[in-house]
Amino acid sequence: MNPSPLLHLIDSPQDLRRLDKKQLPRLAGELRAFLLESVGQTGGHFASNLGAVELTIALHYVYDTPEDKLVWDVGHQSYPHKILTGRKNQMHTMRQYGGLAGFPKRCESEYDAFGVGHSSTSIGAALGMAAADKLLGGDRRSVAIIGDGAMTAGQAFEALNCAGDMDVDLLVVLNDNEMSISPNVGALPKYLASNVVRDMHGLLSTVKAQTGKVLDKIPGAMEFAQKVEHKIKTLAEEAEHAKQSLSLFENFGFRYTGPVDGHNVENLVDVLKDLRSRKGPQLLHVITKKGNGYKLAENDPVKYHAVANLPKEGGAQMPSEKEPKPAAKPTYTQVFGKWLCDRAAADSRLVAITPAMREGSGLVEFEQRFPDRYFDVGIAEQHAVTFAGGLACEGMKPVVAIYSTFLQRAYDQLVHDIALQNLPVLFAVDRAGIVGADGPTHAGLYDLSFLRCVPNMIVAAPSDENECRLLLSTCYQADAPAAVRYPRGTGTGAPVSDGMETVEIGKGIIRREGEKTAFIAFGSMVATALAVAEKLNATVADMRFVKPIDEELIVRLARSHDRIVTLEENAEQGGAGGAVLEVLAKHGICKPVLLLGVADTVTEHGDPKKLLDDLGLSAEAVERRVREWLPDRDAAN
């Protein structure tokens, strides 16, 4: 017997719209069960998708997609959308090489109106679509679906401010679950969640005082009165909640509706039908529960935000509560987290800043041990960097823990607010290089290129876990802005010191002596260079720093070898290999140079090893490319 008879009938939103509205709650249950099964086996974003099931069904039921445009913010919650838009039978390939992307992707489906991965872009994109439709004389509807966490970012407010002053038909759906990845921070979430109802509570207190003695004498009356009191409180709080939210968004020029139960799919359909007929900017405030329908995720939405897989228990189609086995080798994130706590214990000036990535950036222990020196500024990368600059001006030692892909969002602040003033801010740049399943929106392939051209910046790339700690300590003590970039996942297994040793800034080291060919390698590619060099009897230099780069070492290697190969897990254009070429040109050295990095292409999602091989950066691919490049007599050696 088919466990999902309704879902089985749906291959497109057109099929969905043939259902009776009363069938939608049952469909929601089937879709949620399908999510538990599919994500449980393939992994992926979990809790946010469970919370968006009814909302997704209602949106596709009411709006004429793909003619009407649904723009999902970030895209963590887009799995139900993919299931309902013809990709149900491909869900087993989610985030795998050659399979479905973990986020909406325009080239994947006509229903994916806008490619996403970063937060707070949906309102601006949907507004642009609405403006284009008006200019072209169309009658389409544009809908932005954004979470309350993403709404804290400045870009979302910039778009709200612009939309409120434009005569376009735009609906913003605020999916309010009080979470982004971590619990939300800042004034806006408190504003949205405020339940201050002083007058009603005062009235209730008076009534209780006046009637309590009488009610005590009537059997069952007190219990009934308590239920009535609870209901009145709830209604009053909802009314106050709506009043406050209405005031905020209507001041932006939006007509506010809500808050609405985001898990009552039939009511959502009625509300959305009404909103679709309205003109001008509209905002629908929907209350949902992250992880809805799976208790473990409801109780710990941070832990279940994304999962590697959820094994079955006893054959049941339910996630397992078993924790994954800890890695034998520490991750670079763990190395950073331990270094940060050790350094903070020795230096009371150290403060840590994160743009809503406490868990991912390894700051959980730091927050617990040093809460007064921990700052989660929300999804606000630009503010995080400028805030760090202000702290540095007053003698503090800020460490900004940020993913490479998110540092892109704060580039002006890095240049204007930090580097031009030569402020000693340390950027711990996580997820540098290929990241795997999250794909191109999260790949850290551009930081070496955009950092090394910034004045006063020190840019370091460790080759293993111990070197990561060494370079963090070194850059922390530098009286200048600095960035240490390190990859996702585990390193080489190198023993990690507990000390605070430092190295000389701008100096690399020779890892292997060889002949004729010199590998000048950066960061994670040092291990690859060593593996290939064993087969080619080549020299390997671990440069450690991209800026300042070790000119003396480069010149010495160029003059003592026949050729040079540069290796980096970064874009070739403007990257570390380019820095090597600049040194050679400066010193008038003309030698054959092979630059190996990420070519001018958009990387895909999938297993990192497979992606590196496709990009020509695995050890096997590097050996093949170098042998093809070598003169025939050397390639045979």
From Swiss-Prot:
GO terms for molecular function: 1-deoxy-D-xylulose-5-phosphate synthase activity; magnesium ion binding; thiamine pyrophosphate binding. It comes from the Bacteria. SMART domains: Transket_pyr. Homodimer. This is 1-deoxy-D-xylulose-5-phosphate synthase. Catalyzes the acyloin condensation reaction between C atoms 2 and 3 of pyruvate and glyceraldehyde 3-phosphate to yield 1-deoxy-D-xylulose-5-phosphate (DXP). It is an enzyme of class 2 (transferase). InterPro entries: Dxylulose-5-P_synthase, THDP-binding, Transketo_C/PFOR_II, Transketolase-like_Pyr-bd, Transketolase_BS, Transketolase_C, Transketolase_CS. Its cofactor is Mg(2+); thiamine diphosphate. GO terms for biological process: 1-deoxy-D-xylulose 5-phosphate biosynthetic process; isopentenyl diphosphate biosynthetic process, methylerythritol 4-phosphate pathway; terpenoid biosynthetic process; thiamine biosynthetic process. Binds 1 Mg(2+) ion per subunit. Binds 1 thiamine pyrophosphate per subunit. Thiamine diphosphate binds at residues 76, 117-119, 149-150, 177, 294, 381. It comes from Neisseria gonorrhoeae (strain ATCC 700825 / FA 1090). Pathway: Metabolic intermediate biosynthesis; 1-deoxy-D-xylulose 5-phosphate biosynthesis; 1-deoxy-D-xylulose 5-phosphate from D-glyceraldehyde 3-phosphate and pyruvate: step 1/1. NCBIfam families: dxs (TIGR00204), PRK05444.2-2 (NF003933). Belongs to the transketolase family. DXPS subfamily. Mg(2+) binds at residues 148, 177. Its EC number is 2.2.1.7.
